[in-house]
């Protein structure tokens, strides 16, 4: 299970911390939370006000502030396969209501190359982090309860992996072709793969 709350300014932006703590409390049934800022495409009738949109840096700041230190801003990194302005992700182990980060900023790793597409890499991440692993028997489990013990830690990575992610959709007022070219989320239509934001792009009444 991945929780996927849509965030709307003046509606639930102050509930980010509560949503995160609830998701952690439900681990390992809940494998992560995806914060989705409301998009202004599709059937949106008009252009949003200037402060309606939620930015990624604002969302990262609020996640750190409202989590009371459970998550730090530097633990939420740009996607290594999409454009860095399109989203972020954090990879953690959940243990006793706390999150232990598995990622750190490193300019030499996690760079998308030509060996596989961005979509392939994202599918591999989902398979690795969001699918439930096989259940070990009692004799195979480490019961020490110490996250610093290697066997216990490796068990927890498999069974209590937890992700925090977000994706910022584009609309008619924010469309950026450099972001669109690196899209990994597509709609298949009439034999073509069309970037998600472009497929649902709608004009606004002036």
Residue ranges and their predicted role:
Residues 82-85, 177-179:
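A short catalytic or substrate-binding loop motif that flags glycine-/basic-rich loops and adjacent residues
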Residues 90-206:
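Radical SAM enzyme core and accessory elements
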Residues 1-52, 56-77, 81, 99, ...:
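Conserved C-terminal portion of the radical SAM core fold
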């Amino acid at each position: 299970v991945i929780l996927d709350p849509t965030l709307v300014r003046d509606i639930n932006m102050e509930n980010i911390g509560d949503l995160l703590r609830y998701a952690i409390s439900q681990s390992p049934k809940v494998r992560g939370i995806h914060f989705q800022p409301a998009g202004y495409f599709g059937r949106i009738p008009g252009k949003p006000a200037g402060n309606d949109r939620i930015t990624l840096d604002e969302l990262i700041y609020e996640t750190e502030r409202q989590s009371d230190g459970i998550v730090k801003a530097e633990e939420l990194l740009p996607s290594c396969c999409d454009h860095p302005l399109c989203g972020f992700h954090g990879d953690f182990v959940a243990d006793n209501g706390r999150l232990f980060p598995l990622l750190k900023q490193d300019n030499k790793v996690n760079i998308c190359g030509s060996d596989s597409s961005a979509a392939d890499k994202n599918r591999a991440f989902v398979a690795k982090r969001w699918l439930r692993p096989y259940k070990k028997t009692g004799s195979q489990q480490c019961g020490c309860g110490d996250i610093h013990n290697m066997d216990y830690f490796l068990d927890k990575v498999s069974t209590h992996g937890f992700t925090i992610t977000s994706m910022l959709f584009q609309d008619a007022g924010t469309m950026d072709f450099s972001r669109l070219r690196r899209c990994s989320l597509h709609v298949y239509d009439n034999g073509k793969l069309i970037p998600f934001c472009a497929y649902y792009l709608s004009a606004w009444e002036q």
